[in-house]
Amino acid sequence: MVKDDPVVSELRRTLAGLHQALAANGLVAWTSGNASARVPGRDLLVIKPSGVGYDDLTAESMVVCDLDGTRVDGDLSPSSDTASHAYIYRHM
């Protein structure tokens, strides 16, 4: 199960922190721009939710999707960039 997976939990925490660092360093504006991470050994990725400000991001708000871009865990919609990120991970 994704919610109980310690690797997914750690990626959620790491990515939430990285997004806050992007904003703090002036590398993104409003809600545009995001990073993602592929879950090692699984056809899953973790990505920022759509429309959520960087200051409001938490590990719990990060979204887990499969490599087709379909949300498999998380309460919010994934980023509008999810399809691009999923495409890259499918072809790496």
Where do the protein language model's features map onto the residues?
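An anion-binding catalytic pocket shared by soluble metabolic enzymes
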Residues: V2, S9-M92
